[in-house]
């Protein structure tokens, strides 16, 4: 059965992005279904993070159209855009926590920016989000410099979830984590998806994460999406890069542990 318009939460058509004469994407098409976890993979320089940032509006496309929630954000006023952007949360690779703020204060940043809310309510909501991502209550008072790598990821995720987003954007969420920490983060993403009904758009190179979390995978190569499908579709592909990536030694280890 064909997907209806309501099923598609992110719709990228004919995207072209470039930095000067260097073209990153050309005629790139991608549709993300509501409620799925989609993993974006590709070789170095294929523009995985550029695609994420372009969808977020942090880079202007040179051609093509991007719709999120069925809306072309290029048609919105700045106020309308800010309102719609509250419907998604973002966790960048570096976490982007404010070093001078505690974990709780970091989580409260979106409330202070977008909502008129008293301190007691902000503190209560921040506590809920901190618990939701598996951090202990004591972590609320800690500063980023006092956190482990895994705790920083979870604190950043708590802030991304602050306003109950419909879409969660993740840029290399398990980068820098040890295998145990990465597996725990994968489990958390699965739990949040099922509990909150999230759509998750994830740039990752982590094969274990692809196996553990993704409903579908989109492969970037040759300036576009060359294949989108399930892990089974990836394993059946004869494309040289896909074959090398999904059938190499690391892939076999990931498959064995899945």
What do these predicted regions represent?
Residues 164:
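Conserved catalytic motifs of ABC-family nucleotide-binding domains
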Residues 72, 119-138:
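Conserved ABC ATPase "signature" region
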Residues 143-147, 151:
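Conserved ABC ATPase signature
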Residues 56:
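Helix-to-loop junction immediately C-terminal to a conserved catalytic motif
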Residues 168-171:
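Catalytic Walker B motif of ABC-type/P-loop ATPase nucleotide-binding domains
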């Amino acid at each position: 059965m064909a997907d209806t318009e309501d099923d598609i939460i992110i719709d990228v058509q004919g995207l072209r992005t470039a930095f000067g004469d260097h073209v990153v994407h050309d005629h790139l098409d991608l549709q993300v279904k509501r409620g799925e976890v989609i993993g974006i993979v590709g070789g170095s320089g294929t523009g995985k993070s550029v695609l994420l940032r372009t969808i977020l509006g942090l880079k202007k496309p040179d051609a093509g159209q991007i719709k999120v929630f069925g809306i072309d954000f290029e048609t919105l006023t700045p106020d309308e855009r800010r309102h719609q952007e509250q419907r998604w949360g973002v966790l960048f690779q570096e976490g982007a926590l404010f070093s001078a703020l505690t974990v709780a204060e970091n989580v409260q940043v979106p409330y202070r920016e977008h909502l008129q809310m008293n301190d007691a309510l902000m503190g209560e909501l921040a506590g809920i989000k901190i618990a939701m991502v598996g951090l202990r209550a004591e972590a609320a008072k800690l500063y980023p410099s006092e956190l482990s790598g895994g705790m920083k990821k979870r604190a950043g995720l708590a802030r991304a979830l602050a306003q109950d987003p419909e879409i969660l954007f993740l840029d290399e969420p398990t980068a820098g984590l040890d295998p145990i920490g990465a597996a725990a983060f994968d489990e958390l993403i699965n739990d949040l998806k099922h509990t909150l009904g999230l759509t998750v758009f994830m740039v990752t190179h982590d094969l274990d994460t692809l196996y553990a979390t993704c409903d579908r995978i989109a492969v970037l190569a040759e300036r576009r999406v060359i294949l989108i499908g399930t892990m089974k579709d990836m394993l059946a592909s004869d494309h040289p890069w896909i074959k090398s990536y999904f059938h190499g030694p690391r892939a076999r280890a990931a498959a064995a542990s899945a």
